[in-house]
Regions:
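N-terminal cap/lid segment of alpha/beta-hydrolase-fold proteins
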Residues: 1-30
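Short, surface-exposed "cap/lid" segments of acyl-processing enzymes
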Residues: 25-71
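Conserved acidic catalytic loop of the alpha/beta-hydrolase fold
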Residues: 98-116
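Conserved hydrolase catalytic core segment
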Residues: 115-120, 124-152
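Alpha/beta-hydrolase
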Residues: 154-239
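Conserved alpha/beta-hydrolase "acid-adjacent" motif
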Residues: 245-251
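Catalytic histidine neighborhood in serine/cysteine hydrolases
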Residues: 259-275
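Catalytic histidine-centered segment of alpha/beta-hydrolase-like enzymes
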Residues: 272-284
Length: 289
């Protein structure tokens, strides 16, 4: 049984929902545990990405997995997602997400007593994590990335998404529903995840939101590259799912080659599509991270 706690951290007038899990409640005077901050993508909030509870399923919660292994695990809902507030300004793009992280990380360091965090992001969350690390390298021990897009070259998903770029560019939010979540998991490789997963996401997300921001979609279609590997000094892990339609392998290898650190790994996981933590073979993702 894990211990959990909810917080709110302010970035200007935006209230950011922050969620934490450990194997037990913190005790006065104890040594700091290693901290892992998990950064969500374009559609599903932090808690419902990384602490998803799937009826009849097991090991879907990345937070539980790493809490059980001694980590102090955190996630945040970015502006306009989940339980966080929405200012009505902008569209919660990738740079705004990096600003969210810049507001949250000092709070995490104060609460935990840690000097640095380990940070992992998936999809547009990987871009947010990169941008944060570039701006605040002194706070990041290790960086993990999955479903990353660098220049966007060779990405069939982005090629299709660009057809709706005029719509995304003129509206700050887009609608989500069960059908949309189901499409997310059938887009790359039908059968790579259980049908119960999008249903569990809908049950968790739709009581909170019926729309999510468009900013990261616009950024990934029109404003790449947003990550600058030459400016990332820390040890870095890049994970690509075999069937991921966003993360084209040559594009990622170009990113990987530009990382200055010699402490780096590039991992391709067979049987996995765009959402590695929610696939049938999610144990491979857990092992890699």
């Amino acid at each position: 049984m894990t211990w959990s706690q909810e917080y709110f951290v302010n970035r200007e007038d935006v209230r950011l929902y922050v969620y934490r899990k450990r194997d037990a409640a913190p005790q006065v005077g104890e040594a700091a545990k290693p901290v892992l901050l998990l950064v969500h993508g374009s559609t599903v909030s932090g808690r419902n990405t990384y602490d998803l509870q799937v009826p009849g399923g097991k090991d879907y919660s990345v937070m539980d997995y790493f809490a059980d292994r001694g980590y102090d695990v955190w996630t945040v809902d970015h502006e306009g997602y989940g339980r966080s507030s929405w200012s009505g300004r902008g569209n919660s793009d990738v740079p705004t997400g990096a600003q969210d992280l810049a507001a949250v990380v000092p709070f995490i360091l104060k609460e935990t007593g840690a000097e640095k965090i380990n940070i992992f992001g998936s999809s547009s969350g990987a871009l947010r994590a990169c941008m944060y690390t570039e701006a605040h390298p002194e706070t990041v021990a290790r960086l993990g990335l999955s479903a990353l897009v660098y220049t966007g070259a060779g990405s069939p998903t982005l090629e299709q998404r660009r057809k709706k770029l005029p719509e995304y560019s003129t509206s700050p939010r887009r609608k989500v529903d069960l059908a949309f979540y189901e499409g997310m998991f059938n887009r790359d490789k039908p059968g790579s995840s259980e049908d119960s997963v999008p249903k569990a996401i809908a049950a968790a997300e739709l009581p909170l939101v019926s729309e999510v921001p468009t900013g990261t979609y616009v950024d990934m279609c029109a404003n790449l590259p947003l990550a600058h590997p030459e400016a990332i000094p820390c040890p870095t892990l890049v994970i690509r799912g075999e069937y991921d339609g966003i993360a084209a392998e040559p594009d990622l290898l170009d990113f990987f080659a530009r990382l200055p650190t010699k402490d780096k790994q590039f991992v391709v996981l067979s049987g996995i599509a765009h959402n590695p933590m929610m696939g049938v073979v999610r144990n491979k993702f857990h092992h890699a991270l």
